Amino acid sequence: MDFDSPLFFCITRKTTIMETMNATIKTLVYNLVILDKSGSMESIRKEAVDGYNETLGTIRTAQLKHIDTQEHFVSLAAFCGCGVEMIYDKTPIKDAENLTQDRYVPCCMTPLYDAIGITIQQLKKDIAHAEDTAVSVTIITDGYENASKEWKGDAIKNLIEDCKKDGWMFAFVGAGEDILKVASTISITNTVLWDKTEEGTRIMFSVAGKANERFYDKIAAPCCTEASIADRKKMRRQFAEECYDALTE
């Protein structure tokens, strides 16, 4: 090719412009926590609130660290047999105040599938037209599905698998010994076994926080931020499976 030709100049200029555009598109990072609010959570109510506030702190730190490439939002869905309460709903992290015990009051049963299906389906719909998004979903429960009316396990599995194609990161935090089996039925491979004590709850939120930090760092790397939107999604699919694995190596 003639490097002095107008054609070469146009191709080079187009490539440079596209690279610049990709590098300047901020990733909108949605952090969704689906938190059990059934009656059995009352014994660790304070620890759950404190742990979630630590999660907010982790996200605030990530926003400052990656201010040029990421914009963080938080959603907290607290669920029990009374329904799903969106305590935060795609709230910019700069506007998210700490959770208080007055806002998180455990009671009644565990409609786990309804909580997952309702919140994920709505978030998926809300961000469908955003140019570049990354999503982290953490599901925390000390019990088992026992009260859902709208969603079944197979439908939840299909929904999660569909979201994972877009690079969503999912984690299932459970107190039962058969957590791996429960998580696998809905296609979640990232799991944290939760010792439901004061110290165990602190450790659980810390583990989830570190995994999210790794995810934020990976999607902020130049290899990702300078890639096309399609390639970013491909990278996130890989990152979503690596971030929890790294904590057990």
Predicted region positions:
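Acidic, low-complexity intrinsically disordered regions
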Residues: 5-249
